[in-house]
Amino acid sequence: MNLANYFPVLLFILVGIGVGLVPMFLGKILAPSKPDAEKLSPYECGFEAFEDARMKFDVRYYLIAILFILFDLETAFLFPWGVALRDIGWLGYASMVIFLLEFIVGFVYIWKKGALDWE
């Protein structure tokens, strides 16, 4: 195994790390730093913070987010299938129909359970 073949990869990694770290270190070294109480205080639209930034979210938001990701991934699988539909034949068509039927059954189950209701 010749390690010289991996030199471009090593160079790419080092340049990538350098592009990320060099501006940070230059900013730390060259930027003027005069911290005071006003600069270190939290900023909220020009006003003092009214309350703690950590608020409790309703669990329904998380449920909707998970469902969105799930159905978004479904569409991510649909695009390549639509492009390659002529090449994959009936087996690919049938497998995608089964895949979509599983998602439809899941969607109906979620709907019947009331996961999409905001009451």
Swiss-Prot record:
Pfam family, one: Oxidored_q4
Principal location listed in the UniProt entry: membrane
Keyword Nucleus in annotation: no
Transmembrane segments: 7-27, 63-83, 88-108
Top-level class of the enzyme under EC nomenclature: translocase
Keyword Transport part of the UniProt annotation: yes
UniProt EC number: 7.1.1.-
Assembly mode: NDH-1 is composed of 14 different subunits. Subunits NuoA, H, J, K, L, M, N constitute the membrane sector of the complex.
The protein, known as: NADH-quinone oxidoreductase subunit A
Protein's organism: Polynucleobacter necessarius subsp. necessarius (strain STIR1)
Phylogenetic lineage: Bacteria, Pseudomonadati, Pseudomonadota, Betaproteobacteria, Burkholderiales
Gene that produces this protein: nuoA
